[in-house]
């Protein structure tokens, strides 16, 4: 995420969003701030047209950049849709079963890093991390290259424990499902049993 915008653009976007700097990278929180600021700055609502244009430009550059980061990582697990055609978030995709699909067995899923046969979202994103890193042979330095729980913990400086899973769930929920490059039909379904 830090490579998408220049330092000045990042600071300008943080300022325009009225976002605390420590929340940079929390896409869901940033998206809420963006929507709120759009309502405040919209020229039809008496807002500042110049600031609105700057906000839209920076926000679009960030979203397009995050989308491109994922596209450049290599072969896709699923057919990609255009960024304007797929706006469903991960939580919208799985609606009522999102939290159960995210992590099937927290203790087991957190412990079994690269060898898990589980198909919950947490384990699938971890497997994806290992496949990408094996082929690219570089660490994840930018949030958005990888959305696994380990990179999330590293990015925000948190230990990988059971207590992290709810924060991770909240972080992943608003992210467009297409950015995660998951085959949604392979994700664990609690309704169908083990």
Curated annotation (Swiss-Prot):
Sorted UniProt keywords: Acetylation, Activator, Early protein, Host cytoplasm, Host nucleus, Host-virus interaction, Metal-binding, Oncogene, Phosphoprotein, Transcription, Transcription regulation, Zinc, Zinc-finger
Q: Name one GO cellular component term.
A: host cell cytoplasm
Residue ranges of the C4-type zinc fingers?
Answer: 109-123
N-acetylmethionine-modified residues are 1
Q: Does the keyword Acetylation apply?
A: yes
Mostly located where? Answer: host cell
Zinc finger boundaries on the chain: H1C3-type? 129-151
Q: Which InterPro entries does the annotation name? A: DnaJ_domain, J_dom_sf, Papo_T_antigen, Papo_T_antigensf
Query: Which GO molecular function terms does the record list?
Result: zinc ion binding
Q: Which Gene3D superfamilies match?
A: DnaJ domain, Small t-antigen, unique domain
Q: Which SMART domains match?
A: DnaJ (SM00271)
Domain of life assignment = Viruses
The J domain, residue ranges: 12-75
What would be one Pfam family of this protein?
Papo_T_antigen
Q: What subcellular compartments does it reside in?
A: Host cytoplasm; Host nucleus
Role: Promotes efficient viral genome replication by accelerating both G1 and S phase progression of the cell cycle. Inhibits host PP2A by binding to the A subunit, thereby displacing lower affinity regulatory B subunit. Inactivation of PP2A in turn results in the transactivation of cyclin A and cyclin D1 promoters. Late during the infection cycle, ST may induce dephosphorylation of host MTOR, leading to the inhibition of cap-dependent translation. May establish and maintain high levels of viral genomes during persistent infection in cell culture.
Q: What is known of its domains?
A: The common region of ST and LT proteins comprises the J domain. This domain is essential for multiple viral activities, including virion assembly, viral DNA replication, transformation and transcriptional activation. This domain is also required for cyclin A-transactivating activity of ST.
Share what the entry says about its subunit structure, partners included: Interacts with host PPP2R1A; the interaction inhibits PP2A activity.
Protein known as = Small t antigen
What organism, scientifically named, is this protein from?
Answer: Hamster polyomavirus (HaPyV)
């Amino acid at each position: 995420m830090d490579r998408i915008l220049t330092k000045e653009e990042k600071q300008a976007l943080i300022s325009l969003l009225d976002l605390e700097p420590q929340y940079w990278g929390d896409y869901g929180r940033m998206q809420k701030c963006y929507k709120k600021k759009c309502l405040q700055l919209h020229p039809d609502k008496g807002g500042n047209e110049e600031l609105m244009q700057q906000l839209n430009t920076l926000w679009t550059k960030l979203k397009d950049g995050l989308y491109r980061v994922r596209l450049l990582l290599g072969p896709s697990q699923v057919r990609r849709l255009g960024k304007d055609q797929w706006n469903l978030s991960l939580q919208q995709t799985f609606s009522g079963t999102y939290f159960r699909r995210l992590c099937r067995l927290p203790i087991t899923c957190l412990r079994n890093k690269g060898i898990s046969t589980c198909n919950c979202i947490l384990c699938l994103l971890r497997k994806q991390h290992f496949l990408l890193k094996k082929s690219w042979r570089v660490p994840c330095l930018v949030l958005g290259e990888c959305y696994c729980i380990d990179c999330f913990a590293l990015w925000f400086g948190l230990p990988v424990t059971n207590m992290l899973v709810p924060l991770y769930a909240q972080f992943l929920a608003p992210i467009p499902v297409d950015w995660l490059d998951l085959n949604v039909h392979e994700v664990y379904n609690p309704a169908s049993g083990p």
